[in-house]
Design a protein with these regions (language model features):
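Conserved active-site tyrosine of GNAT-family acetyltransferases
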Residues: 179-180
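Alpha-helix N-capping/helix-start residues
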Residues: 24, 51, 141, 170-173
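Amphipathic alpha-helical recognition patches that constitute DNA-binding helices
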Residues: 29, 125, 129, 142, ...
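Conserved acetyl-CoA pyrophosphate-binding loop and the N-cap/start of the following alpha-helix
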Residues: 134, 138-147
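Conserved beta-strand-loop-alpha-helix junction that forms the acyl-donor binding cleft
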Residues: 131-135, 150, 162-176
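Conserved GNAT acetyl-CoA-binding A-motif
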Residues: 123, 154-167
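GNAT-family acyltransferases
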Residues: 1-133
């Protein structure tokens, strides 16, 4: 089964946040929200590796949504599979100061990815990366089921996946409880 040459990444609305297609500009916003602080305890990668992975995932997602083949986009790797990247956006003012909580990052508080999308096996891996001040607030619990619903939904509404899996280091008990 072949994946489409071009993907239209749908916006997804959650109760607390909404998701929009990630852009190249959002890569810099991940630095502003300190998304890579403590990465080794969360994903098992150090800051440099996590930053590199997010950069590659966003670029692959943008390339796919533009209809570029991996060898045309400059981000290709013959062994890499397709990726979809969403930016997680909030419009919350939790402290009641009249300013949006994430105004310094254009309201981006993290990203969620479907990576290693395999059309033949109909499987993908899901990964969430949140800014350090946005962890443990229930955002992952809000958005993960919605992204998985899109992944499992039959085409054309979704990707028609049969399996979506997650890789979490054993010591990250907080994330393990969300993913279960």
């Amino acid at each position: 089964r072949e994946l489409p040459e071009r993907i239209v990444i749908p916006p997804i609305k959650g109760e607390m946040v909404h998701l929009r297609r990630a852009t190249i500009d959002d890569i810099a916003r991940m630095e502003v929200i300190e998304a890579y602080v403590g990465a080794s305890g969360i994903t098992g990668k150090d800051r440099v590796a996590e930053r590199g992975a997010v950069n590659a995932w966003v670029r692959r997602s943008v390339a796919w949504s533009n209809g570029e083949k991996s060898n045309e986009s400059g981000v290709g790797d013959p062994e890499s599979r397709r990726t979809i990247a969403w930016s997680i956006v909030t419009e919350a003012d939790h402290d009641g100061d009249g300013e949006l909580d994430a105004a310094s990052s254009d309201n981006v508080i993290g990203m969620i990815f479907l990576i290693d999308i395999d059309g033949w096996a109909r499987s993908a891996r899901i990964q969430v990366v949140l800014g350090k001040d946005y962890r443990g607030r229930g955002y992952s619990r809000d958005i993960m089921p919605r992204v998985m619903t899109y992944g499992f939904a039959p085409e054309p509404a979704g990707l028609g996946m049969h399996r979506i899996w997650v890789a979490v280091p054993e010591q990250n008990t907080r994330s393990v409880s969300v993913y279960q």
